[in-house]
């Protein structure tokens, strides 16, 4: 049976000493609950999975594409989305990625984006928000629980032995 194996990309930095030591490998995540060093690394990882057709967040999503439009770093009159995705029924998903937990305004931001997209871009389809971050606080968890349009995910890095 097949198992998903998650890989953590490593960032190489050359060691500039005279003995030509091997480059030091620095993980792209830090320990503090395990988090990505930048939102771009998290976004790259998620984009790779969506482009490969992998089911993410328990929903079969693909990155939004229309003539002249692509859903990564999607710019619209109210701001810029990390990722705009859609499900097989054409419902839209606004995905906001945060590398850690210090974003108290994430819920409010996504709620405003959902309202704008529902009014201007949904064409009768539904619009949902997904917030993905490390270690969400209780206030964010409660806000999302009260809003059927939102889902909250905590990312985790795991390793599985292949036998």
How would you label these PLM feature ranges?
Residues 1-163:
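Charged, terminal alpha-helix-loop-beta segments
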